[in-house]
UniProtKB/Swiss-Prot annotation:
Transferase is among the record's keywords: no
Protein name: Photosystem I assembly protein Ycf3
Gene that specifies this protein: ycf3
GO cellular component: chloroplast thylakoid membrane; plastid
Keywords: Chloroplast, Membrane, Photosynthesis, Plastid, Repeat, Thylakoid, TPR repeat
Membrane topology recorded in Swiss-Prot or TrEMBL: Peripheral membrane protein
Chief localization: plastid
Length: 170
């Protein structure tokens, strides 16, 4: 039974109903419909913290999905799962792959910056200020890209960039 039929959460049910209606009325191929079904089921599993199941659905959606834009969101969500699992190198890889297909994903740039900032903090704890600065500089570059795409967002990142003198805002 598809995951969307066994979920008891009201929001998830609403999403599933709307998604099912869209699948019926929007002209798409059967492959596109199957890809979206796997993507939808992956999102539902991910929202419940069932990451292994979510990844299985996302990988199947990737196998079926041909549109680069749609693939970017699948890759982004795979990156989110790896971030949640503390697998930062894998997460960065998936965020990069998502951005190759869709360079207008500020949330991917932000998440990459957060990972780099975290690695900088870890380098400080290990007493390696030179490595820390390199990670912080990389975080700054990613945050600048996220902010350029959505200037009103990422206020904390903007403040950090100002405080650390890595970027001046008008």
């Amino acid at each position: 039974m598809p995951r969307s039929r066994i979920n008891g959460n009201f929001i998830d049910k609403t999403f599933s109903i709307v998604a099912n209606i869209l699948l019926r009325i929007i002209p798409t191929t059967s492959g596109e419909k199957r890809a979206f079904t796997y993507y939808r089921d992956g999102m539902l599993a991910q929202s419940e913290g069932n990451y292994a199941e979510a990844l299985q659905n996302y990988y199947e959606a990737m196998r079926l999905e041909i549109d680069p834009y749609d693939r970017s969101y699948i890759l982004y969500n795979i990156g989110l799962i790896h971030t949640s699992n503390g697998e930062h190198t894998k997460a960065l890889e998936y965020y990069f792959r998502a951005l190759e297909r869709n360079p207008f994903l500020p949330q991917a740039f932000n998440n990459m910056a957060v990972i780099c900032h975290y690695r900088g903090e870890q380098a400080i704890l290990q007493g390696d200020s030179e490595i820390a600065e390199a990670w912080f500089d990389q975080a700054a570059e990613y945050w600048k890209q996220a902010i350029a795409l959505t200037p009103g967002n990422y206020i904390e990142a903007q403040n950090w960039l100002k405080i650390t003198k890595r970027f001046e805002f008008e």
